[in-house]
Amino acid sequence: NTGKVNPEHKNVVTYQKDVEQILTDTESSYMVIPQGDMLLVSIPKNENMQQIKSGKVILLPKKTGTDNQLALKVKSVTDAGNGMLQIIGETPDISEVYQKVDIQKEKQADMSMFVPNEDVVASVSNLNSGLKGASIQATVSAENGKIVELKEQKLGTVGTFSGSVELSAPKVTAIVDADFSKRLHPVYREVSVSLNEDITAKAELKFSSKGVGSEKIYVGHVSTYLGDGLYADVVCYLNVSADGKATIQYKLANTLTASYINGDFRINEDSNGSWEGTKAEVNGQLLGEPQLNLRFFGYWFDEKLYGSIDIVGVQADIGPKLKATATVHDTEPKLCTNLDLYGYASIGVNTDFGIGKWLKNHTRITLTKVILDNNTANPLRGKWHYEDGKRTEGDKCTYQNKKDKENSILRKIIG
C-alpha cells in the first residue's frame, strides 16, 4: 500500500468489549458543557442509561445537524431530576475505545461548513469565476471554495498588513490500520493522510518605520466527517513576515502526504506554484500553512474542539520567500535592485499526540522535511533586476554593462 485508498477495501471497526454505545430517543437530546479537562453531558434518562457507571467508556450518537460525536470515560453519574442524567467524564485513550481499526476514506470537504476566525476575518464569500488574478476557477466552483478577506492586522511592532486568501475545497485521504487488542502495546500497520488543496493569497504590507515584523494568523477551519467516527480537520494559517514594504501574491496547487507503513515513515509533497504582481523593496515572505488533523470523535464548542482522540497531525509551511538587495549609484541608473524570489515548502508531523508522539518515543525517524529551498534544484525560483523601479530586459544590469564598456574603451586608449 502506498497511502492510496483501495475502492474495494472493506472497512472494519471493532470496539473493545466493555465499551457501551448509548442510544437516545432523539439524537439531539443531549447537551455538552466543558468543565476544565472534563466534559459534562446532560442527557434524558431511558432504559439504555442503566449501563452508565463510573469507569465505563461510552459512545454517544452523532448530534442531528452537526458532526459532533463523543466517546467518554465516565467519572461520575448524577440524577439531576426532571428526567435528566448528568455525566462527567474525560476523553479516553484510543486503546480504551477500539480493538481493531482498518478503514480507508476519501472525501472532499464541504466549504459551506468553513468556520472563519472572526478576530481576523472581515468577510467570507464564495469563490467564483469573476475573480481577478486567480487562475484556479476552472476547477473550483462557487459551492466549494471561499474568498476570505482579512481585517488589517498588526505585523510585529513596526506596521500592518491586510490581504485576502482564496481557499478551494480540500480533498482528504485517510487510512488507519491499527490493532489495540493489547492495550499497552498498540500495533500500527499503517497511518496515512493526504491533503490536496489550492491556495491563492495576497498580502499588502504597510510599515510605519523600517524594521522587522512577523505574524502567524489562524484564518479558520473546516471539519469533514469521513465515517465510522473518523474526522479530518483542515486548519488554515498564514505566516507573514517582512522587513520594509512589500506586496506578495502567490497561487499554490499542493498535495502533501504523510505515511507510516509497517515501520517505514514517508513524507511526500507535490507543489506547483506561481506568483503574479509580487514586488518588494526589501525582504518578505507569505507562507500558507495548511494543517490536517485526523481524529476519532470530538465536539466543537465556541470554536474549540473538545473530546477528540487525535490520530495524526500534519502541517506544512508553503509559499514564496523573497530577498532584495539595493545598490545606489552616482550616475544613471541611480538605484539597482535585485529581487530573488523562491518557493519554500516544508512538511512535518505533530509529535504531541497520536502516531507522531508514538514515533518520536519509539523510533529515530526524522519527522520534518524541507521540500523546496533556495537552491538550484528548486523549479520555483527566479531572479529579477530592477533599475529605478523598472524591470530591465533579460534582467540585465545596464549600469554594469556601461561600466564594462567604459573600462574597455579606457583600456584601449591607455593601451
Which ranges hold each PLM region?
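Ser/Thr/Gly-rich low-complexity blocks that favor extended beta-strand/coil architectures
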Residues: T14, L23, Q51-G81
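Short, solvent-exposed secondary-structure boundary/capping segments
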Residues: T78-P92
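Short, low-complexity, Pro/Ser/Thr/Gly-rich segments in the mature regions of secreted, periplasmic
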Residues: G394-G415
